[in-house]
Amino acid sequence: MKDSWSSNSTTSTAIRLVGSPYGTDSPFQPTFTYPIYGEAETIYGYEGLAIKLSVASGSLVPLLEVTYRAKNEATTAEIDDVEGKIKEFLAPDFLSTSSPSAMEEFETVVKADKEFRPLGDKVHSYTRGKVDKGKAKSSTASLASSTLSASDPNARVFEIYRSTWHTPGFREYHRRMQLFTLLFIEGASYIQEDETNWEFFTLYEKVSRDDKQTWHFMGYTSLYKFWCWPDSSRIRLSQFVILPPFQKQGHGGALYTTVYDQIRERANVTELTVEDPSEDFDRLRDGNDLRRLLAPGGFADSAKAQNKLHAPLDKEWIESQRLQHKLAPRQWSRVLEMVQLMNLDTTDHEQVKQYRLQVKARIYRQNKDILMQLEKQQQRSKLQETFEGVVEEYGDMVGVDVEDLLDDGPSGTGALYGADEEEDQEQGQGDRHYSNGNGPPRKMARLA
């Protein structure tokens, strides 16, 4: 079997948002294609295979074009049906160049996109400054913090719309945009349209030219509402995707913050949770939640003024704050521990010890089922290893040097209290636990 007849389905695929402004219409590759072409992400039977998916940047009508230099007609092995496999995941109204009129039809769609309008209710808008292509990389930070007026000629305007299955035309629109979840979210799957508890927040760029406005898709998130006894609900953020041309520019944070603000205003919602977050999303969420707690006059200032940040914590007060901020227990604990780290006196050995006990106890109780499967020495080793990883991550996030907390040398604060001394306290604090409704962690990498 010639290797030249095998193609990687991910690197062979190129996506382009046709009509997207300011240079964001360049082709980009998906992150995953295994939901479509199998775990090996390999397509057999073609040489020089190229899968081009052109998408109208507003309406998201797709045009599929599959080309190759040669097809292995001589083989007795099964040749993969490239178009047949991907069309199972495309919206029913997709176009394919296997039809002679498809290119012309797609050109008509792109022209008609000038009349496209976002579906649903606008819930937020924000601006970013226009950046020259040559300066884009160095200007990411300023883009994220721009507060230009929407009427400023140097402003780019972005809008977020909320939709449900009841929004006219949204079911059809969602069938087009859901493909991006498979291509950019590991483990994603399509959601069921007969489940009525879904809602969606979609991000667009709004472009004004010659007194006309057009809207161009950038990403979206889906949320699911769970009923909670007796008369409240939890909202679970299920899927979250920002397409590659718009990443690393603060748009993910803007979308997440908008969702959080919307949820927090709902009196009958107890908390916002996230379904199996990736490490990238954890960082995005941590940064935005932390920024909110550190806002002038906010939680951190209030807690510090009341001397509430030192371990052991006032559990009743902390829980009341969690309910007020509507963060899930694990996420609340993480950002709270970051705020505590920022206010920790690392020269105070007792403060350091109590902080370490608190963090380890939280890790232990959230992962007790997994840890109990290990020998006692392995438990202690894994707990210490995870603690060190967590604190290093926190230090990177908040800009605190944590070397003294982790130093195992004779003069390091971390060496003053051994695992034997802490073990009983860690496990004793583990008796009280939060239930997040999602069951135990799925893998050890999620210990923290």
Curated annotation (Swiss-Prot):
<feature type="active site" description="Proton donor/acceptor">
    <location>
        <position position="275"/>
    </location>
</feature>
<dbReference type="GO" id="GO:0031509">
    <property type="term" value="P:subtelomeric heterochromatin formation"/>
</dbReference>
<feature type="region of interest" description="Disordered">
    <location>
        <begin position="407"/>
        <end position="448"/>
    </location>
</feature>
<keyword id="KW-0963">Cytoplasm</keyword>
<keyword id="KW-0156">Chromatin regulator</keyword>
<dbReference type="InterPro" id="IPR017380">
    <property type="entry name" value="Hist_AcTrfase_B-typ_cat-su"/>
</dbReference>
<keyword id="KW-0012">Acyltransferase</keyword>
<dbReference type="InterPro" id="IPR000182">
    <property type="entry name" value="GNAT_dom"/>
</dbReference>
<dbReference type="InterPro" id="IPR019467">
    <property type="entry name" value="Hat1_N"/>
</dbReference>
<dbReference type="InterPro" id="IPR037113">
    <property type="entry name" value="Hat1_N_sf"/>
</dbReference>
<comment type="similarity">
    <text>Belongs to the HAT1 family.</text>
</comment>
<dbReference type="Pfam" id="PF21184">
    <property type="entry name" value="HAT1_C_fung"/>
</dbReference>
<keyword id="KW-0234">DNA repair</keyword>
<dbReference type="GO" id="GO:0042393">
    <property type="term" value="F:histone binding"/>
</dbReference>
<feature type="binding site">
    <location>
        <begin position="247"/>
        <end position="253"/>
    </location>
    <ligand>
        <name>acetyl-CoA</name>
    </ligand>
</feature>
<dbReference type="GO" id="GO:0000781">
    <property type="term" value="C:chromosome, telomeric region"/>
</dbReference>
<comment type="subunit">
    <text>Component of the HAT-B complex composed of at least HAT1 and HAT2. The HAT-B complex binds to histone H4 tail.</text>
</comment>
<keyword id="KW-0539">Nucleus</keyword>
<dbReference type="GO" id="GO:0010485">
    <property type="term" value="F:histone H4 acetyltransferase activity"/>
</dbReference>
<feature type="region of interest" description="Interaction with histone H4 N-terminus">
    <location>
        <begin position="224"/>
        <end position="226"/>
    </location>
</feature>
<dbReference type="GO" id="GO:0005634">
    <property type="term" value="C:nucleus"/>
</dbReference>
<dbReference type="GO" id="GO:0005737">
    <property type="term" value="C:cytoplasm"/>
</dbReference>
<feature type="region of interest" description="Interaction with histone H4 N-terminus">
    <location>
        <begin position="39"/>
        <end position="41"/>
    </location>
</feature>
<keyword id="KW-0227">DNA damage</keyword>
<dbReference type="Pfam" id="PF10394">
    <property type="entry name" value="Hat1_N"/>
</dbReference>
<comment type="function">
    <text>Catalytic component of the histone acetylase B (HAT-B) complex. Acetylates 'Lys-12' of histone H4 which is required for telomeric silencing. Has intrinsic substrate specificity that modifies lysine in recognition sequence GXGKXG. Involved in DNA double-strand break repair.</text>
</comment>
<keyword id="KW-0808">Transferase</keyword>
<protein>
    <recommendedName>
        <fullName>Histone acetyltransferase type B catalytic subunit</fullName>
        <ecNumber>2.3.1.48</ecNumber>
    </recommendedName>
</protein>
<dbReference type="InterPro" id="IPR016181">
    <property type="entry name" value="Acyl_CoA_acyltransferase"/>
</dbReference>
<dbReference type="GO" id="GO:0006281">
    <property type="term" value="P:DNA repair"/>
</dbReference>
<feature type="binding site">
    <location>
        <begin position="240"/>
        <end position="242"/>
    </location>
    <ligand>
        <name>acetyl-CoA</name>
    </ligand>
</feature>
<feature type="site" description="Interaction with histone H4 N-terminus">
    <location>
        <position position="198"/>
    </location>
</feature>
<dbReference type="Pfam" id="PF00583">
    <property type="entry name" value="Acetyltransf_1"/>
</dbReference>
<dbReference type="InterPro" id="IPR013523">
    <property type="entry name" value="Hist_AcTrfase_HAT1_C"/>
</dbReference>
